[in-house]
Structures are given as C-alpha cells and as structure tokens.
Amino acid sequence: MSNNQILFERAQKTIPGGVNSPVRAFRSVGGTPRFVARAQGPYFWDADGKQYIDYIGSWGPMIVGHVHPEVLSAVQNVLADGFSFGAPTEAEIEIAEEICKLVPSIEQVRMVSSGTEATMSALRLARGFTGRSRIVKFEGCYHGHADSLLVKAGSGLLTFGNPTSAGVPADIAKHTTVLEYNNVAALEEAFGAFGDEIAAVIVEPVAGNMNLVRGTPEFLNALRALCTKHGAVLIFDEVMCGFRVALGGAQTYYGIAADLTCLGKVIGGGMPAAAFGGRRDIMAHLAPLGGVYQAGTLSGNPIAVAAGLKTLQLIQAPGFYDALTAQTKRLADGLAAEARAAGVPFAADSIGAMFGLYFAERVPGSFAEVTKSNVERFNRFFHLMLDEGVYFAPSAYEAGFVSSTHDDAVIDATLAAARRAFAALAA
C-alpha cells in the first residue's frame, strides 16, 4: 500500500471524506488523492516522494510558483514580529493601496480571509446599499459556499431558485435568481421582469469552476448597462481570475468597471487572504461608517499580507504577463495539437495564466455546453497524466493554472507526456 493510500485511510477516520475541501477527494476521477509533502517552483512531491508538474498551484494563488524566494523572505521577515494582532497595521494600508492602484474600479477595499467571505460580504453590502433583496447569479459560476449562492435555477425564469446543498433553507434560496451564462436575451428578460428588485448581479467574468469559460464582451457589457439602468450593483467575482488574466484582472482585460470586486488567491500569495472593494460611496455603508456589518478576527493577518503584498509587487515586473500568457497559450495549443494528431476529440483554451481542457469538439460558452464534454475520457486522461507525473485538476469542471516558473522545459515535458496519454486514449 502506498503512503498516499495509508494517509487517505487515516484521514477518513477524523476528517469527513478524508479532505478539507471536496474536490481533493478524487471522487470525480476515482483513485487515491495525492498527499503533498512539499513543493518548489512548478513542482510538488507527494507522500511517496514522486514529483509532479503542478497545474493547480493551490487552485490559483501560486502565480510566481511555489516557495518563491522573495515571498518566502517577506514572510520570514514578519514572523518574529507576531502572527496576529487583532489591530490595524501599516502593512494593511500598503496592500490596500497596491490593490486600489492595480484595479482602477476599486476606490476602497477591505481584507478578509477567504473568497467565500469576500462574496458573502459584497452581497450583504449590495443589499444594504440598495435596500433590495434579490440576487442574480449564473449557472456554472461558483462564488463560495454562502447559503444564498448555493442555488440552482428553477424550472423557469420567474421560478424561485432551488438550493443545491442540503442545509440551505428555501426561504434563503428564493431570493436568488439563476440565469444562463453568456445569454444576453435571458439577462434582458430578467431585468425587464424584475429589474427594480435586483440588489446585485454577481458574475465570474472569466469562469473557472465549470472549467474555463470566458464571458463574452457582449454579455459583460450588457450586464454593465442593465445594472446601471436599474440601479443594481454589479459585482465581479475575480477571486480566481483577478491578477490571473491580466495585471488588473478581467476588468482591465475587458475594459469594464464593476461596482464591487471580490479578490482572493493571488492576493494572499498562498496564504489565506481575500478582499472585496469598489466604489467609495458603496464601501461607505460598511461598519464602522455605515450600517452594514462585516468583521473578521484574522482579516488583514500580517503574515498573509506580507506574502500577498510581495506577490503583487513581483507580478508588476515588465513583461511578466506577456511571458506568462504566451507560455499558457503554448501549453493549451500544444495539448490541442497532440490530441488532434492522435485523433482524439478535444479542445483547449487559455486566457492570461488560466487554461481549460475539454474533451469536446469545441470550446464551450456555457455550463450546458460544458456538461456535454466526455467526462469518462477526461478521467482516463487525468490518470494517464498523473502516472506521467503531471497533475491537472481532478475534475473535468475545473480550470488549470500556469505559473511564471513553468518554463519551456516544463511545458515540453507536459506535451511529451500528453502525446503518450492521447495515444493510449486513441488505442
């Protein structure tokens, strides 16, 4: 029995499912999860000592690679000063100033400890600001596990939303309307029917939890125009795509300003940190200035802030995003070429340092299209690549991530492994 198997059996005795986040359990792909012992650059090593090329990167934060020496030094420099204070620090101001500088639509920002806290707080703030209750979200977009966001579409446009998780009261779910991603007609119909009831529309401008699906410019511009017309707050959930698709996130990529923005992952540099921010007049409704309560014991934790601030400084290096985008595109295009050569139906896409792999004829534009992918074939491909020492997301419905340490040799090794994997699939 491998060390990974031993650890997984042991973990299941004291941790539900043996993991602290469901996707890690390998339920989608089958087999035994890899327990990570250490990581460096684009690699990690599991409990059996096997090395893997890592295309998850802690689900996005590790944009400069694992244990970057400057990030490590920044963390080490603050450790001796104290782990947490429950009081303001100068470093909190510095990271807030950096975020406001990099994301033009953010005039003020508040730190929290997780992406779920960021989206949950942004929605509460939007409701407090507008005095309305209804939220609009989109099928396939993931915004954390707050009750009001674990909702799927009802049977028709005006039907109340239905909870997607046990433990979510129907009375909460009914305030959330779920529409199809990238469907402008459905969006216009919804605003025509109840636009003046909508407190906020929350969207991933580049979705990463139904695999990678880009928001179309037409869709995102329609969102901006309709929210402005009806006085609804437009919330861009950039927890995943923020500082991933461009230095200023999806908003600078598309040239669209949100009213509120949720950030995470990269801004913590691998530590638990997230944030939400936006227009000053909206943020002024937060306590202690306004009546919308939000708080957190570890918000602005000095260790997380040190890691995040150094990461934000590193990604501003000249040419950083040009090189990262080119390398990610090389990976995606190379995988598609290898599949084509083997005669395996497959498509790939990339934007910035995010990529998507689809066992389908074309790149999907909605959740319904994503679900038509051949999941069984993906699962086989995942395990073939895992055996080759390449670690993709253990689910057909997750995006992948490239770091600045994924150099030509790493990409070449990945494509060589993929060539063998696609050949096995085609056999």
From Swiss-Prot:
Question: What processes in GO biological process is this protein linked to?
Answer: protoporphyrinogen IX biosynthetic process
Q: Which cofactor does it need?
A: pyridoxal 5'-phosphate
Q: Which PROSITE patterns match?
A: AA_TRANSFER_CLASS_3 (PS00600)
> Recorded E.C. number(s)?
5.4.3.8
Q: Which PANTHER family match?
A: GLUTAMATE-1-SEMIALDEHYDE 2,1-AMINOMUTASE (PTHR43713), GLUTAMATE-1-SEMIALDEHYDE 2,1-AMINOMUTASE 1, CHLOROPLASTIC-RELATED (PTHR43713:SF3)
Q: Which domain of life is it from?
A: Bacteria
Q: Which family does the record assign?
A: Belongs to the class-III pyridoxal-phosphate-dependent aminotransferase family. HemL subfamily.
Q: Which residues carry this modification: N6-(pyridoxal phosphate)lysine?
A: 265
Question: What HAMAP family does this protein's entry cite?
Answer: HemL_aminotrans_3
Please state what the protein is called: Glutamate-1-semialdehyde 2,1-aminomutase
Q: Which GO terms describe its cellular component?
A: cytoplasm
Q: In which pathway does it act?
A: Porphyrin-containing compound metabolism; protoporphyrin-IX biosynthesis; 5-aminolevulinate from L-glutamyl-tRNA(Glu): step 2/2
The subcellular localization recorded is:
Cytoplasm
How does it associate, per the subunit comment?
Answer: Homodimer.
**UniProt entry keywords in alphabetical sequence:** Cytoplasm, Isomerase, Porphyrin biosynthesis, Pyridoxal phosphate
Q: What reactions does this protein catalyze?
A: (S)-4-amino-5-oxopentanoate = 5-aminolevulinate
- Residues in a coiled coil are none
